[in-house]
Amino acid sequence: MKPYQRQFIEFALNKQVLKFGEFTLKSGRKSPYFFNAGLFNTGRDLALLGRFYAEALVDSGIEFDLLFGPAYKGIPIATTTAVALAEHHDKDLPYCFNRKEAKDHGEGGSLVGSALQGRVMLVDDVITAGTAIRESMEIIQAHGATLAGVLISLDRQERGRGEISAIQEVERDYGCKVISIITLKDLIAYLEEKPDMAEHLAAVRAYREEFGV
């Protein structure tokens, strides 16, 4: 685990974005942890979040021309990541996002920001069923652009309804790499360093045994 990944876990714990306990997911599964990126909800949170996304992007080595944030949750992520890339990595890249409802006045259309073209890096909070990615792919392909990759904050590394994860489905269906700031494996490595969190470690390991990919 790299220093920025450890720092991200601590940031998420401090903001109660990441919690350990017993939670029922939308799928009905009982999970020993819960991640709610919506609680990154202040200016400082967003500034820090952008730095972690930018760090993971640079670390990945994936070449891309533009950041795309799917509405709605991807919009502030794309914006803050673009700022962080410019401020901390000297990479001044364009970004854009979609509207859920196309405008019929003013500049019109369903996109805001830069023209959607070239190699697109899609940024979002998490991938649950992959629905937002599929909707975004329709937009990207309609503009003649290509998907360079997808970056999310957390990869839960767990099976969907079948034998593979929603993330593996996206990688298979679109031939792109999905990267994340942290994975379930990183969470377990972090818990292993914290004796006072041993009860959570056992529960998370058991969950991975049952649902992991």
Curated annotation (Swiss-Prot):
It comes from the Bacteria. Pathway: Pyrimidine metabolism; UMP biosynthesis via de novo pathway; UMP from orotate: step 1/2. Orotate binds at residues 34-35, 128, 156. Keywords: Glycosyltransferase, Magnesium, Pyrimidine biosynthesis, Transferase. GO terms for cellular component: cytoplasm. GO terms for biological process: 'de novo' pyrimidine nucleobase biosynthetic process; 'de novo' UMP biosynthetic process; pyrimidine nucleotide biosynthetic process; pyrimidine ribonucleoside biosynthetic process. Its EC number is 2.4.2.10. Changing residue 124 to N: Loss of activity. Mg(2+). Mn(2+) can replace Mg(2+) as the divalent metal. The role of the metal is to bind 5-phosphoribose 1-diphosphate and form a Mg-5-phosphoribose 1-diphosphate complex which then serves as substrate for OPRTase. Its cofactor is Mg(2+); Mn(2+). It is an enzyme of class 2 (transferase). The keyword Transcription does not apply. 5-phospho-alpha-D-ribose 1-diphosphate binds at residues 26, 72-73, 99-100, 103, 105, 124-132. It catalyses: orotidine 5'-phosphate + diphosphate = orotate + 5-phospho-alpha-D-ribose 1-diphosphate. Disulfide bonds: none annotated. One of its GO terms (molecular function) is magnesium ion binding. The keyword Transferase applies. Belongs to the purine/pyrimidine phosphoribosyltransferase family. PyrE subfamily. Homodimer. Catalyzes the transfer of a ribosyl phosphate group from 5-phosphoribose 1-diphosphate to orotate, leading to the formation of orotidine monophosphate (OMP). This is Orotate phosphoribosyltransferase. It comes from Salmonella typhimurium (strain LT2 / SGSC1412 / ATCC 700720). The lineage of its organism: Bacteria, Pseudomonadati, Pseudomonadota, Gammaproteobacteria, Enterobacterales.
